[in-house]
UniProtKB/Swiss-Prot annotation:
Source species: Shewanella sp. (strain MR-7)
CDD domains for this protein: Syd
Cellular component, GO annotation: cytoplasmic side of plasma membrane
Record lineage: Bacteria, Pseudomonadati, Pseudomonadota, Gammaproteobacteria, Alteromonadales
UniProtKB keywords: Cell inner membrane, Cell membrane, Membrane
UniProt xrefs under NCBIfam families: PRK04968.1
The protein, known as: Protein Syd
Main location group: membrane
Family per similarity comment: Belongs to the Syd family.
Length: 216
């Protein structure tokens, strides 16, 4: 079962929740990065938050290059989850706590995402662990949300360790269990690390990555 219908519905509900509760669209700090998502004027030199809406991509994002580089087949949901929209990361409440789902802000962001997924998969190979790929963060960024590449199930994972808790048998069922979390935008501070340039959620991945490197 594709995760796309569940993702479509969640993104629609996400913006409707902000409009119903706050009377405005969700806002995001793009840190100078343009996007088709941005509503209204955009000044690349400004550090102000922007209002945004998800935008369907005209040309779908593909992970065929990642599959070719690593000589493996990725679970098909990765193309639906990351390749259908340009959007900001989205916040959620769930039976397992609060968290954030990663999305792709622009084409350069998609390229950076692919680099990070390659890095994550190479780390799993180095540790001789089954392949997973990340979709977001749980509990203030202390835990990653990952998809088991063998069967598409969703798990809690701490970098360097095996996935610890299965949350849902599929990405679609996981997304269906989420509800939008309404919160003001947060301006994330970037840590200096090559090839990890995504504003926001990648800052949390960087912190976890530094914690992992410190253990090795």
């Amino acid at each position: 079962m594709s995760c796309l219908p569940a993702l479509d519905k969640f993104l629609q509900n996400y913006h409707q929740s902000y409009l119903s509760t706050l009377g405005e669209l969700p806002r995001y700090y793009p840190q100078g990065e343009p996007s088709l998502c941005i509503q209204g004027e955009f000044d690349e030199s400004s550090d102000e938050a922007v209002s945004w809406l998800p935008v369907k991509r005209e040309q779908l994002g593909s992970f065929a290059n990642v599959e070719h580089a690593l000589e493996l087949t990725l679970w098909p949901d990765i193309n639906h989850f990351y390749g259908e929209y340009f959007a900001a990361p989205v916040l959620f409440d769930s039976p397992w706590g609060t968290g954030e789902l990663l999305q792709v802000w622009n084409e350069a962001d998609f390229d950076a995402l692919q680099q990070n997924i390659i890095g994550h998969l190479m780390m799993k190979q180095k540790l001789k662990q089954p392949a997973t790929w990340f979709i977001g963060l749980l509990d203030e960024g202390d835990k990653m949300l990952t998809v088991d590449n063998a069967d598409g199930s969703v798990w809690v994972e701490i970098p360097g360790e095996l996935p610890s808790t299965q949350l849902a048998p599929s990405l679609a069922e996981f997304i269906e269990a989420l509800s939008p979390r309404i919160a003001p935008p947060v301006k994330h501070e970037e840590l200096p690390m090559p090839a990890l340039e995504h504003p926001g959620i990648f800052a949390s991945f960087k912190r976890m990555w530094h914690n992992l490197i410190g253990k090795r």
